[in-house]
A protein has these predicted regions:
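Acidic/His-rich structured neighborhood in mature extracellular/periplasmic domains
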Residues: 116-258, 264
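C-terminal soluble interaction/assembly domains
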Residues: 284-381
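Extreme N-terminal basic, low-complexity initiation segments
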Residues: 2-13
Length: 381
């Protein structure tokens, strides 16, 4: 652990102050420290991100946001705690429109959680792998620079962007101000969270000097190619090309640097594995599987797993001593028989779950990263 701590300190010393969190980041609500991306809010990434503008249907009659006492109180609170004027906040929120389809999307139940063999195939398609290779080829210098600075492999950054938005194809078409206002003021179940994100969004627009009425994003207010929520944008997004602004929609440098910074800031361990196939002794299988809860176990030292008849193939000699978990992935049935694969989940797997807490998401990022790297390595020089 001392080695990893020293490694992190050296890397932090390398990061220039120009990509530190913005002034006021310490005031960000605690929810901003979670995996605040669109796919962190839903199990299935991009389930509704491409809903078109103007598709909201007929909304019930309701007072415009500018006329509502709760909205005026929110504007006053923003003005009292930031350097944004109350009239500016009220003017911006006067331009926000309630979107009933957003509320419907948030309330849509996931009747049966998907299994690995149902969840992963669309996200591991040949089209997505090819798009990832092309993105890597185009941005090879930036990805190499980010890997050198943050210690995050290029294929992992590329895979996350592929899962989230297919490299910017599906960044969402709702106005962000509409999405966040709808969920902040007309979705009581998550109102505190989304009021915090609306606050972060207005601060972000103020700091970046763009109108909050223009950007579009997901139905949950996630932004750009990496689908950062506003709080994560303010805390983790970086101006990786040094042009004085951060653009997560169109600037590949900022996108790549921001994703790598996010993972590094959540304790990515350079050179360490994500997943390795697990081997479970026949006499230990029942006891090992009883440790699983929702397809993943608690974390224990690798030596403790080994003592219980569970080990991993090809463990690097310099593997970190951090605790690891046992992961189950449901494979497609054969002849009516359920099948599963088992994996040892190393600390970097859990770092990916800080981007999205789903074990299926993190496993898909790993699988897509492996597929993209293999395809990239197979290209002629």
């Amino acid at each position: 652990m001392e080695r990893e701590g020293a490694q992190r300190k050296r890397r932090e010393a390398m990061i220039p102050s120009s990509i530190s969190p913005p002034l006021g980041a310490n005031r960000i609500a605690s929810v901003s420290h979670r995996a605040l991306t669109l796919s962190a809010l839903l199990l299935l990434p991009q389930a509704f991100a491409a809903e078109p503008l103007g598709s909201a249907g007929t909304a019930p009659a309701r007072a415009p946001y500018a006329q509502r006492a709760d909205v005026r109180a929110f504007a006053a609170e923003i003005a009292a705690s930031t350097d944004i004027g109350q009239r500016d906040v009220e003017r911006w929120l006067a331009g926000a429109k309630y979107q009933p389809r957003i509320v419907a999307a948030m309330d849509r139940p996931l009747l049966v959680p998907p299994k690995w063999f149902e969840y992963s195939p669309p996200l591991l398609s040949s089209d997505r792998v090819s798009a990832g290779v092309a993105f890597w080829r185009t941005n090879a210098y930036l990805l190499a620079r980010a890997e050198a600075l943050y210690g995050v492999p290029a294929e992992v950054v590329v895979a996350i962007l592929g899962v989230e938005t297919i490299y910017g194809r599906n960044t969402g078409r709702y106005r962000v101000i509409d999405a966040l206002a709808t969920l902040a003021f007309d979705y009581p179940r998550r109102a505190p969270f989304f009021r915090g994100e609306l606050r972060e969004y207005l601060l972000l627009a103020h700091e970046q000097r763009w109108s909050p009425l223009v950007p579009t994003g997901s139905f949950a207010g996630a932004l750009g190619m990496p689908q950062f929520m506003p709080g994560s944008h303010r805390q983790y997004a970086v101006d990786f090309d040094g042009d004085g602004r951060i653009d997560l929609w169109h600037d590949s440098a900022d996108v790549i640097g921001s994703v790598a910074n996010y993972l590094a800031r959540h304790d990515w361990l350079e050179g360490q594995p994500i997943l390795l196939p697990a081997r479970i002794a026949a006499e230990s299988q029942d006891a090992a599987l009883r440790r699983l809860d929702g397809g993943i176990s608690e974390r224990r030292p690798l030596a403790a797993w080994n003592a219980d008849g569970v080990d991993a193939a090809d463990v690097p000699a310099d593997v970190a001593a951090d605790p690891v978990g046992l992961l189950l992935l449901e494979e497609a049935p054969e002849n009516g028989e359920a099948r599963a694969s088992y994996w040892i989940a190393f600390p970097n797997f859990y770092v990916i779950t800080r981007y999205n807490k789903s074990r299926l998401y993190a496993a898909t990022v790993f699988a897509l990263a492996q597929a993209i790297k293999a395809a990239r390595d197979a290209e002629p020089l």
